[in-house]
Design a protein with these regions (language model features):
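Flexible, glycine/charged-enriched surface loops at secondary-structure junctions
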Residues: 56, 171-179, 208-220, 261-270, ...
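Short, glycine-rich nucleotide/cofactor-binding loops
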Residues: 3-15, 148-158, 302-310
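Phosphate/nucleotide-donor binding subsite
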Residues: 51-99
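Short, conserved active-site loop motifs that form the nucleotide-linked donor/cofactor pocket
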Residues: 59-60, 141, 211
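Glycine-rich phosphate/nucleotide-binding loop
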Residues: 116-129, 133-143, 226-230, 234-312
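Glycine-rich phosphate/diphosphate-binding loop of Rossmann-like nucleotide-binding domains
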Residues: 15-16, 28-33, 39, 151-219, ...
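N-terminal phosphate-binding or glycine-rich loops at protein starts, especially the Walker A/P-loop
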Residues: 1-43
Length: 312
């Protein structure tokens, strides 16, 4: 297996990418191809990895790409004009069969555009979308779309539900995953026009599309185990996702401050530390890797823009 990695994408690139790949390569049976500015990658690899570089270098290959698509770049323009960027080179390699999967922590809009224009959409899908995995009371919750498409039509949300249902059925083994529509209430009449129209389409065609649609789901109910997939447009989904990440940080920080407030609280917390550690770990978005683009012909993974070595 060949894993293509955009070494220049993300807030902490290329250092976090280099560290992450070097740590992971020992535990996976794959060749990793780093795509980016060759001189920079060679220099940083030597400085960061030191002697460890000799151990992993045989399974890590560097492909030169002179340009970088930044977070500030206009997505479509960047994909069309920066032909020698790490992202575009990666997409072309994936399309041509020079790799099995492409991973990037770079510009989400550019990643969506490149995946759509270069790798290509699956027939019948208007817009690929990001399927992110979140912790839930029983197992995990898939959120789709979690940031790729900020402006959607009702048919897009129906297709998101269809793709997510097939994805969960084939990867997790849930035969009829429960699909919910993220909304401000459970009633059919609640929500904006996009959500209300999407609800009616999902209700009407769920049987034909083999979607187990259970209706509207409020954010506060999403993690209780009653839904397997939460459907939203990319704007709403991303706000929801970032809110969860922020709340997780708040909980971890508050617990830490409470426990270490004084010696008595530290001693009192000792029996609960394993459970608290597991809880804190479940709230850490770094434990859940990247989001998979569903709807394109080959696997494309979007890592968090602020990914560190652990997440990679």
């Amino acid at each position: 297996m060949k894993i293509l990695v955009d070494a220049m994408g993300g807030d902490n690139a290329p250092d976090a990418v280099i560290k992450g790949v070097a740590n992971a390569i020992e535990d996976i049976e794959a060749e990793v191809i780093l795509i980016g500015q060759e001189a920079v990658l060679n220099t940083r690899s030597k400085e960061i990895l030191g002697k460890k570089l000799d151990k992993v270098s045989s399974r890590i290959k560097i492909i030169n790409a002179k340009e970088v698509i930044t977070m500030e770049d206009i997505p479509t323009q960047a994909i069309k004009t920066k032909k020698d960027s790490s992202m575009v080179v990666g997409f072309n390699m994936l399309k041509n069969g020079d790799g099995d999967v492409f991973i990037s922590a770079g510009n989400s809009g550019a990643l969506l555009t490149g995946a759509t224009l270069i790798v290509g959409r699956i027939r019948g899908i208007d817009r690929p979308a990001l399927a992110g995995i979140l912790p839930a009371y029983h197992g995990n919750l898939v959120l789709m779309d979690c940031g790729a498409n900020t402006n959607c039509k009702p048919i897009n949300l129906v297709q998101f539900a269809q793709m997510a249902s097939i994805y969960i059925s084939n990867t997790v083994g849930i035969k009829e995953p429960k699909i919910g529509l993220l909304n401000i209430g459970t009633e059919e009449t609640k929500g904006n026009e996009l959500v209300k129209e999407s609800y009616q389409l999902l209700k009407k065609y769920s049987q034909d599309l083999k979607i187990n649609f259970i209706g509207n789901v409020e954010g506060r109910e999403a993690f209780l185990g009653d839904v397997d997939v939460l459907i939203a447009d990319g704007f709403t989904g991303n706000v929801f996702l970032k809110s969860i990440e922020g709340f997780g940080k708040f909980v971890k920080k508050s617990l830490k401050e409470s426990i270490y407030k004084n010696a008595f609280s530290v001693i009192g917390a000792i029996p609960s530390l394993p459970a608290l550690s597991r809880f804190a770990k479940s709230m850490d978005y770094k434990e859940y890797g990247g989001a998979l683009f569903l709807g394109v012909k080959k696997p494309v993974v979007k890592a968090h823009g602020s990914s560190d070595a652990k997440l990679f």
